[in-house]
Regions:
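Extended C-terminal regions of large enzymes
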Residues: 1-189
Length: 189
């Protein structure tokens, strides 16, 4: 199956094969375009764990397979718990960016250290969001509200500039300027 006019045909199930027991054996759909961008590259899964995207180190073939397993697992969590990839990916990336820039700390995140590419940190944050537990109660409100929460908590309005939103909604992975999409005005109004 594929989306209308899309040649990727990414809607099929696959079992995750990983050296990480958290992900190994999970059966899920393969990530679609939005998932690849928003809960894949946006979260640093295609980089060496803990490195920033700017440091860009090449991955080995085995590391690429693990990166894809992380993307598929994070997609599974979003699918399984009816979460939106676009808002979820933007929100989690915001938290990672704020942490990287030392604008928030592990203490602000109930002890979670959200370094780029760490699927265990993403798993822990998503579970807190799903249960609205601890900091997850604030993160569950979306990217803009997460930025507002940390800006107020840290008394730092500069935090708001890191929220990748337009009119309060997270920016998608697809190009919203495409006339084939038919939704370009939806992002502006």
């Amino acid at each position: 199956l594929s989306c209308p006019n899309c040649n990727l045909h990414c809607m099929f199930s696959s079992e995750i094969t990983s050296s990480d027991p958290l992900m190994n054996g999970v059966l899920s759909d393969m990530p679609d375009w939005e998932a690849l961008g928003m809960v894949g590259g946006n979260l640093g899964f295609m980089e060496k764990e803990g490195k920033t995207p700017e440091e860009g180190q090449k991955l080995t073939q085995a590391e690429r397979r693990e990166a894809l397993a992380k993307i598929q697992y994070t997609t599974f969590l979003h699918d399984n718990y009816s979460l939106d990839y676009i808002e979820g990916g933007n929100n989690l990336a915001l938290v990672q960016e704020l942490y990287q820039r030392k604008l928030i700390t592990e203490a602000d995140l109930d002890g979670i250290k959200p370094v780029w590419g760490d699927v265990h940190a993403i798993d822990a944050l998503l579970k807190k969001i799903i249960l609205r537990e601890g900091v997850g109660d604030h993160l569950a409100n979306g990217t803009l509200e997460t930025a507002k929460y940390f800006a107020q908590k840290k008394n730092n309005p500069e935090i708001l500039k890191y929220a990748g939103v337009t009119h309060g909604y997270g920016q998608p992975a697809h190009g919203v300027r495409s006339h084939a999409d038919g939704s370009d005005l939806e992002y502006l109004t």
